[in-house]
């Protein structure tokens, strides 16, 4: 969002879902803003009144690009509006924390290049996150000219789900990228997600019609991309949609994502209902409908193994998040107890 001119709420993606959360007092005494950039120093906000910078404060809730917030008359944070959707992952590394990627997104463009980066299991991981957030996923395949197996790879992605939208585009060609326009109508918010170097920033620039995002090349030795986007930000394209370009992710672990995994691998869970034993582990048990599907070629063994992997990952991370929340809750109780004892001592004296 590089223009200094104010935007209407409709242009910023305002919907009845958010309007229903406001009171008459909110309309009269607050400014409705959307977070369009998130930096270490704070948030960049856009509203009908213009642009604002909001410093990060420990008393604020965790926020990110896409959030709607209310500011008071002094342009200080007042309230975060409930989110319509929330993209998140487990924070990278050993840290036990959930990291917000973007919020209030209508469509998630899962970008994957058809070179050595192509990985069906990674696409399934992204699909699980999108479905958990109730966001429409669209798989965007780039760099088909670099792969002799492009057509085969495109078919493999299409076979992941009969209802999955898959578009193969040349990220540098506006005519080719026009295939994404049905999801880029005025007031809609779309986000790009994918590994470094797959073409997210190039796609953003092509949709914008200008070189707004820096782009980087691919290392020839391993086809790995270089980080070019280092912070999440919102851009408005000529068609009126808002685009969130996210940094490339070398690590994407699931947080609490059981519903998303179930939806992504729905056919496996349907098959499991026909196993002879209710507690079937889908390994070597007799009468296993899942293993039978693998034997007759209607289910990939790779897909089943990835299903198991994502189930284990999300179950472990969900339990660690729950333990952390319980610890924080206990610390809060202890703090309130100590404060209560201090107050009693004061009244005694």
UniProtKB/Swiss-Prot annotation:
CP-type G domain boundaries: 97-252
Enzyme class, broadest EC rank: hydrolase
Compartments it resides in: Cytoplasm
Gene3D superfamilies registered for this protein in UniProt: P-loop containing nucleotide triphosphate hydrolases, Probable gtpase engc, domain 3
GTP-binding listed as a keyword: yes
InterPro entries per UniProt: G_CP_dom, P-loop_NTPase, Ribosome_biogen_GTPase_RsgA, RsgA_GTPase_dom
EC number: 3.6.1.-
Database matches in PANTHER family: SMALL RIBOSOMAL SUBUNIT BIOGENESIS GTPASE RSGA
Family affiliation: Belongs to the TRAFAC class YlqF/YawG GTPase family. RsgA subfamily.
Name assigned to this protein: Small ribosomal subunit biogenesis GTPase RsgA 2
Organism this protein belongs to: Vibrio vulnificus (strain CMCP6)
């Amino acid at each position: 969002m590089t223009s200094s001119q104010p935007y209407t709420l409709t242009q910023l993606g305002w919907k009845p879902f958010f309007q229903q959360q406001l009171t008459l007092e909110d309309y009269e005494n607050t400014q409705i803003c959307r977070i369009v950039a998130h930096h270490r120093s704070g948030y960049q906000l856009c509203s009908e009144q213009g642009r604002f910078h909001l410093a990060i404060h420990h008393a604020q809730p965790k926020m990110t690009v896409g959030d709607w917030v209310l500011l008071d008359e002094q342009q200080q944070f007042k309230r975060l509006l409930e989110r319509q959707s929330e993209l998140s992952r487990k924070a990278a590394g050993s840290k036990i924390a959930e990291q917000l990627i973007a919020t209030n997104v209508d469509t998630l463009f899962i970008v994957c290049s058809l070179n050595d980066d192509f990985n069906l299991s990674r696409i399934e991981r992204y699909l699980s996150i999108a479905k958990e957030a109730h966001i429409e996923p669209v798989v965007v395949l780039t760099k088909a000219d670099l792969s002799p197996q492009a057509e085969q790879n495109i078919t493999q992605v299409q076979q992941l789900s009969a209802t999955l939208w898959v578009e193969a585009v040349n990220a540098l060609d506006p005519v080719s990228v026009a295939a994404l326009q049905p999801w880029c109508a005025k007031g809609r918010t779309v986000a790009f997600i994918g590994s470094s170097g797959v073409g997210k920033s190039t796609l953003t620039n092509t949709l914008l019609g200008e070189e707004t995002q820096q782009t980087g090349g691919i290392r020839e030795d391993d086809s790995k991309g270089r980080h070019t986007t280092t912070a999440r930000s919102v851009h408005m394209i000529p068609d009126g949609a808002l685009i969130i370009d996210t940094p490339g992710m070398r690590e994407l672990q699931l947080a609490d994502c059981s519903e998303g995994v179930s939806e992504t691998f729905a056919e496996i869970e349907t098959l499991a209902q026909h196993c002879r034993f209710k507690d079937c582990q889908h390994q070597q048990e007799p009468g296993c409908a899942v293993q039978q599907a693998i034997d007759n070629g209607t289910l990939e063994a790779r897909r089943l193994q990835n299903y198991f992997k994502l189930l284990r990952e999300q179950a472990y991370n969900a339990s660690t998040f729950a333990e952390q929340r319980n610890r924080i809750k206990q610390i809060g109780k202890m703090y309130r107890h100590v404060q209560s004892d201090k107050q009693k001592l004061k009244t005694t004296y």
